[in-house]
């Protein structure tokens, strides 16, 4: 007997459509204003660090695609109880990373690239495990691309250095607001 699920087909179509439209207009459906400001600042950091507009756009586009797809999966109730526990663990680890990034930004001479990179790598692994059975290998590669980019110790060291102070301050302001509002 043929196994057919209209829900599965609709979800597949939704993910396919969203993957083709990962621009700002679609992102605003899933990403609030503060998150959007943080993403814009992360784009600026990536662009200045890599000296490449296209590389910076690619990493942010990948980040948005992954965030939207995970949001669609979550809102559609696609995660099993075990996967929901992984999602909770991911959120806690991401929150820990945000608080660590804030602490490093607020207290002089406390920054350690290895600590922040380690937290981001843990987030990557948890997220990959969470979406293992739901997203394509191409989406898994996007996750690796985003987390590998932002967990690069050289990029993190530059971000916490004097040349990126303005960007770091804006990122920290956004992270603080997201934490205060319980969105992170």
From Swiss-Prot:
Q: Which of UniProt's keywords are assigned here?
A: Cytoplasm, Immunity, Innate immunity, Lysosome, Nucleus, Phosphoprotein, Ubl conjugation
Coarse class of the protein's main subcellular location = cytoplasm
Query: What Gene3D superfamilies does the database record attribute to this sequence?
Result: Tumor necrosis factor alpha-induced protein 8-like (1.20.1440.160)
Modification after translation, per record: Phosphorylated by TAK1/MAP3K7; this phosphorylation triggers association with BTRC and subsequent ubiquitination and degradation.
One Pfam entry name = DUF758
Gene Ontology CC, one term: cytoplasm
Q: Tell me the residues on which Phosphoserine occurs.
A: 3
InterPro entries per the record? TNFAIP8-like, TNFAIP8_sf
Localisation per UniProt entry: Cytoplasm; Nucleus; Lysosome
Q: Name one GO biological process term.
A: innate immune response
Report the domain remarks. Answer: The central region was initially thought to constitute a DED (death effector) domain. However, 3D-structure data reveal a previously uncharacterized fold that is different from the predicted fold of a DED (death effector) domain. It consists of a large, hydrophobic central cavity that is poised for cofactor binding.
The record's listing under PANTHER family reads: TUMOR NECROSIS FACTOR ALPHA-INDUCED PROTEIN 8-LIKE PROTEIN 2, TUMOR NECROSIS FACTOR INDUCED PROTEIN
Function of the protein = Acts as a negative regulator of innate and adaptive immunity by maintaining immune homeostasis. Plays a regulatory role in the Toll-like signaling pathway by determining the strength of LPS-induced signaling and gene expression. Inhibits TCR-mediated T-cell activation and negatively regulate T-cell function to prevent hyperresponsiveness. Also inhibits autolysosome formation via negatively modulating MTOR activation by interacting with RAC1 and promoting the disassociation of the RAC1-MTOR complex.
Q: Which family does it belong to?
A: Belongs to the TNFAIP8 family. TNFAIP8L2 subfamily.
How this chain assembles, per its entry, is: May interact with CASP8; however, such result is unclear since could not reproduce the interaction with CASP8. Interacts with RAC1.
Name assigned to this protein: Tumor necrosis factor alpha-induced protein 8-like protein 2
Organism whose genome encodes this protein:
Rattus norvegicus (Rat)
């Amino acid at each position: 007997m043929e196994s057919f699920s209209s829900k599965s087909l609709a979800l597949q179509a939704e993910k396919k459509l969203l993957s083709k439209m990962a621009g700002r207009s679609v992102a605003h459906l899933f990403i609030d204003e503060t998150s959007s400001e943080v993403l814009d600042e992360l784009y600026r950091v990536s662009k200045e660090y890599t000296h490449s507009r296209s590389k910076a756009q690619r990493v942010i586009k990948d980040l948005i695609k992954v965030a939207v797809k995970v949001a669609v999966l979550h809102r559609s109730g696609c995660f099993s109880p075990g996967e929901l526990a992984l999602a909770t663990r991911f959120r806690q680890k991401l929150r820990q990373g945000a608080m660590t990034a804030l602490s490093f930004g607020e207290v002089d001479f406390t920054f350690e690239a290895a600590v922040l990179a380690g937290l981001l790598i843990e987030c990557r692994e948890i997220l990959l495990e969470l979406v293992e059975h739901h997203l394509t290998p191409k989406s898994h590669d996007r996750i690796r691309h985003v987390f590998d980019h932002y967990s690069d110790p050289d990029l993190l060291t530059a971000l916490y250095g004097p040349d990126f102070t303005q960007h770091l301050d804006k990122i920290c302001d956004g992270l603080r607001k997201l934490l205060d509002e319980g969105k992170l």
